[in-house]
């Protein structure tokens, strides 16, 4: 968009390829009041949408009759900015031919996807806000297609993308105004002059274990984020006086624990839990969550703290399913194609046999779990 406005643009990318973590995702963009809703005559008003966003994002603080809906002014302004600009940005990207965007539909079901919290009064548009892209054959694309379309548009517009260039620090003048950026490329420093400004798109800090320990109350044993997501922007911003906001938030997803101990940068998480004869239990054998809830909200169950036992009771959960689910949903992650063909499932012909296998597995990985054991109490 900046290039189309007549500005000169340089993109600096820390990784050795374009696309980042977005290329690993389903490539779904959540856009209120999108062109696809408007074309269908569906009203997604600002007031209603802000109530929904506040209710879902700040459930502890939300109050429908309070100023700013009970949120801090900065939090409310952030939601306002998202509503005001998301659809405008999408419209512009479509107009420029950057994205071949469509209403995102649920694969074989071929219907609009519902919101993750579609059952509350504040949500007046319970489905249809999700937007995706289609590939050359007209099929719904994933994140790799989304980022591929952006990459091709940048090349067509002549925007240089400097790969393996890690932003290191901002350059400011005597008044504090940002006038440039220093990036590191191998053992070299590259100086880039900024006539108007420097815009950052940060990939988070989930692969900076120091930051994770500092800011996350609940264990983050692995992440789908690219390995380059080490929170570099925090120091860059702090050095020029920027104030940090909420650093404890995370978009969470469950994952097989053994997978995370093998490599912190995991290829995928458990998006939706497959199987209809399946449940998740904690180390006490108690079912404590709706397994079919969306991944981010479902994963919050791992942060439950028991003050009587002084423990995070659900730190590890166990996904238990029968032979029917093992066969009917084979290959739907995390269920393996064939039982035992992965590094994280165990099986038994009875509940007691399965318990015995789990006891053995927990003993083998106790150094990574903090000594979690099954407890019939």
Where are these regions (language model features)?
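Glycine-rich loop(s) and the adjacent beta-strand/alpha-helix scaffold that form part
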Residues: 186-189, 193-261, 306
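An anion/pyrophosphate-binding glycine-rich loop and adjacent beta-alpha core
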Residues: 234, 243-374
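Glycine-rich active-site loop/strand segments that organize a redox cofactor
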Residues: 31-81
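Conserved redox-cofactor binding core of oxidoreductases
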Residues: 70-188, 209-210, 257-258, 377
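Hydrophobic "anchor" residues
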Residues: 18, 29, 178, 287-288
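Glycine-rich FAD pyrophosphate-binding loop
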Residues: 4-25
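FAD-binding core of FAD-dependent oxidoreductases
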Residues: 18-33, 197, 205
């Amino acid at each position: 968009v900046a290039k189309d406005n007549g500005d000169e643009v340089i993109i600096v990318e820390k990784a050795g390829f374009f696309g980042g973590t977005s290329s690993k995702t389903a490539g779904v963009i959540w856009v209120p009041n999108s062109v696809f809703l408007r074309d269908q005559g569906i009203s997604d008003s600002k007031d209603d949408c802000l109530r929904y966003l506040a209710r879902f994002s700040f459930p502890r603080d939300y109050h429908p009759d309070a100023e700013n809906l009970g949120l801090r002014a900065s939090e409310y302004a952030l939601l306002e900015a998202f509503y005001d600009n998301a659809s405008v940005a999408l419209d512009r990207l479509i107009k420029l031919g950057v994205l071949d965007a469509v209403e995102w539909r649920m694969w074989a079901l071929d219907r609009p996807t519902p919101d993750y919290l579609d059952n509350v009064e504040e949500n007046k548009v319970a489905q249809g806000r999700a937007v995706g892209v289609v590939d050359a054959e007209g099929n719904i694309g994933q994140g790799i297609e989304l980022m591929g379309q952006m990459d091709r548009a940048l090349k067509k517009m002549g925007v240089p993308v400097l790969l393996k260039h890690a932003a290191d620090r901002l350059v400011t003048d005597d008044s504090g105004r940002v006038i440039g950026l220093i990036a590191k490329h191998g053992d070299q420093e590259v100086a880039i002059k900024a006539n108007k400004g420097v815009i950052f798109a940060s990939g988070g800090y989930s692969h900076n274990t120091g930051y994770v320990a500092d800011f996350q109350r609940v264990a983050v044993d692995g992440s789908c984020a690219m390995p380059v997501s080490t929170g570099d922007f925090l120091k860059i911003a702090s050095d020029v006086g920027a104030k940090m906001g909420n650093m404890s938030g995370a978009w969470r997803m469950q994952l097989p624990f053994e997978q995370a101990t093998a490599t912190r940068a995991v290829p995928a998480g458990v998006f939706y839990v497959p199987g209809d004869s399946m449940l998740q239990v904690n180390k006490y054998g108690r079912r404590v969550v709706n397994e079919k809830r969306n991944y981010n909200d479902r994963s919050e169950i791992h942060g439950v703290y028991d003050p009587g036992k002084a423990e995070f009771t659900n730190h590890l959960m166990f996904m238990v399913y029968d032979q029917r689910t093992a066969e009917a949903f084979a290959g739907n992650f995390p269920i393996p194609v064939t039982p035992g063909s992965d590094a994280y499932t165990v099986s038994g012909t009875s509940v007691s046999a399965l318990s015995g296998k789990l006891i053995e597995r927990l003993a083998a990985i106790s150094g990574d779990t903090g000594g979690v054991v099954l407890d019939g109490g």
